């Protein structure tokens, strides 16, 4: 049981004069702050920091850490997020002094090992995706999307076709797709999915035209279904003068099985913090490398790592058609090291097994859960699948209630209410790293909740029951966030 002291904010635990650490006596001449900083940077009053003991501080943050949920302490079936286990060997490699203690301004000759790793990673990601060249600069998936779209825009402008400003996006797409297009100065055209949950080919034919810049597509899509008409779709877009952009959010389903470049895509971004065990969460850092076909290679961000004839590596900045830098320095190096470690550890056969097992796990879960939840698209899925809580909704229980009830059993809920085209949506992605026993335990809980919806719906409607914080006013929290401590008047 948690007591009030453990639940208190650290500011509420503060007592004037309580000291957590004593600094040693000053052994250098004291200098007035005003002689070092301009007046506008100097506080007029001391910062109102909490005054607590070191033990209080340790216990407070240890308690908060226990309330966190992550892949290292529980199943995390968050759809379209690939919350897989992050092998700890990657952490060991990233902490090698030759990597961890490098500085981006070091002379090239002093960081040849780091440059070689980046060069090899560029080559390997290009091979995995079927692309001809890769940039490692983008800091995350959405940054990769924007980078790819800026290159597409530069490509059309270089051909005197600046009027190509329309980006076609399926209605099942990630929300970052239209957002990235808008930031890149492009307009979005949304097309419908058909009864299969796939892009409506006729809708695509009707949408393309002389103003088409690109089609943005996730394959498999956000419903976890493979876009089986992709070759025909690529032909339609290319014949209209547009390019194909591959959102790599769901690449965990196709490693070693299929490559975007072979499907007809011209540019692709990958989420290294998802597919290649970055890790991710907590706001970052992430990494969203972008691969391109030769038609877009001149527009890659500068610099990229290149190799000289003598075998040494250097930063190639002589790229006159480049869209320029997209990030300070040269990418989130630590995440790139972890991804490289993962690829080298797994090898081609290991990466193939990753996707095979991810797809197998998703289909196993889908079939068992379809006995209690509505399955809107009854066909083989890839790495993730979508259920609907419409049956439970008829009983007065919403998908949100089901998600809250899962918290009582120690599970992070799946993605809910996305994609938007499925009513009362539950999107579940088990990943390849979970055992069958773990999957069965989660399935059994989901089936129990389905029974509760029928027999004792109030238990689900009022969940969670065992968490420190119960139901929040989520709408007000989103619209009127309180982001700092505000003492009671």
Curated annotation (Swiss-Prot):
Pfam families: GcvP2_C (PF21478), GDC-P (PF02347). GO terms for biological process: glycine decarboxylation via glycine cleavage system. GO terms for molecular function: glycine binding; glycine dehydrogenase (decarboxylating) activity; pyridoxal phosphate binding. Its EC number is 1.4.4.2. It catalyses: N(6)-[(R)-lipoyl]-L-lysyl-[glycine-cleavage complex H protein] + glycine + H(+) = N(6)-[(R)-S(8)-aminomethyldihydrolipoyl]-L-lysyl-[glycine-cleavage complex H protein] + CO2. The modification N6-(pyridoxal phosphate)lysine is found at residue 274. GO terms for cellular component: cytosol; glycine cleavage complex. Keywords: Oxidoreductase, Pyridoxal phosphate. InterPro entries: GcvPB, GDC-P_C, GDC-P_N, GDC_P, PyrdxlP-dep_Trfase, PyrdxlP-dep_Trfase_major, PyrdxlP-dep_Trfase_small. Its cofactor is pyridoxal 5'-phosphate. Signal peptide: none annotated. PANTHER family: GLYCINE DEHYDROGENASE (DECARBOXYLATING), MITOCHONDRIAL, GLYCINE DEHYDROGENASE, DECARBOXYLATING. NCBIfam families: PRK04366.1 (NF003346). The glycine cleavage system is composed of four proteins: P, T, L and H. In this organism, the P 'protein' is a heterodimer of two subunits. The glycine cleavage system catalyzes the degradation of glycine. The P protein binds the alpha-amino group of glycine through its pyridoxal phosphate cofactor; CO(2) is released and the remaining methylamine moiety is then transferred to the lipoamide cofactor of the H protein. Belongs to the GcvP family. C-terminal subunit subfamily. This is Probable glycine dehydrogenase (decarboxylating) subunit 2. The gene is gcvPB.
């Amino acid at each position: 049981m948690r007591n009030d002291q453990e639940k208190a904010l650290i500011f509420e635990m503060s007592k004037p004069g309580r000291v957590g650490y004593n600094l040693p006596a000053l052994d250098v001449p004291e200098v007035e702050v005003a002689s070092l900083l301009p007046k506008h940077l100097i506080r007029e009053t001391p910062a109102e920091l909490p005054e607590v003991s070191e033990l209080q501080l340790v216990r407070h943050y240890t308690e908060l850490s226990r309330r966190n949920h992550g892949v290292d302490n529980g199943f995390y079936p968050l759809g379209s997020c690939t919350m897989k286990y992050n092998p700890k060997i990657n952490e060991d490699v990233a902490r090698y002094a030759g990597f961890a203690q490098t500085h981006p301004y070091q002379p090239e000759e002093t960081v040849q090992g780091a440059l070689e790793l980046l060069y090899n990673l560029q080559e390997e990601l290009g091979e995995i995706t079927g692309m001809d060249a890769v940039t490692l600069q983008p800091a995350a998936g959405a940054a990769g999307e924007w980078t790819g779209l800026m290159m597409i825009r530069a490509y059309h402008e270089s051909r005197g076709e600046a009027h190509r400003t329309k980006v076609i996006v399926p209605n099942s797409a990630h929300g970052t797709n239209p957002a990235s297009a808008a930031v890149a100065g492009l307009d979005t055209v949304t097309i419908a999915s058909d009864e299969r949950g796939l892009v409506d080919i006729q809708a695509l034919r009707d949408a393309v035209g002389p103003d088409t810049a690109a089609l943005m597509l996730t394959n498999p899509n956000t419903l976890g279904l493979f876009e089986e008409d992709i070759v025909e779709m690529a032909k339609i877009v290319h014949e209209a003068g547009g390019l194909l952009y591959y959102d790599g959010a769901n690449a965990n389903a196709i490693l070693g099985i299929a490559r975007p470049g072979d499907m007809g895509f011209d540019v692709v971004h990958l989420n290294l913090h998802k597919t290649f065990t970055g890790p991710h969460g907590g706001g970052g850092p992430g990494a969203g490398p972008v691969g391109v076909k030769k038609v877009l290679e001149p527009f890659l961000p500068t610099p990229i790592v290149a190799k000289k004839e003598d075998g040494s590596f250097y930063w190639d900045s002589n790229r006159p058609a480049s869209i320029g830098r997209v990030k300070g320095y040269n990418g989130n190096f630590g995440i790139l090291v972890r991804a490289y470690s993962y690829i080298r550890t797994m090898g081609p056969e290991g990466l193939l097994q990753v996707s095979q097992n991810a797809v197998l796990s998703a289909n196993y879960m889908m079939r068992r859960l379809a006995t209690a939840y509505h399955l809107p698209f009854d066909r083989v899925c890839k790495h993730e699948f979508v259920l609907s809580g419409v049956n439970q909704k008829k009983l007065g229980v919403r998908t949100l209630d089901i998600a809250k009830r899962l918290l009582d059993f120690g599970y992070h809920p799946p993605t809910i209410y996305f994609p938007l085209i499925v009513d009362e949506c539950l999107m579940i992605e088990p990943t390849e790293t979970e055992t069958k026993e773990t999957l069965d335990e989660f399935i059994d809980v989901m089936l129990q909740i389905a029974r509760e919806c029928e027999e004792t719906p109030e238990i689900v409607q009022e969940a969670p029951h065992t968490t420190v914080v119960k139901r929040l006013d989520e709408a007000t929290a989103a619209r009127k966030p309180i982001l700092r401590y505000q003492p009671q008047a």
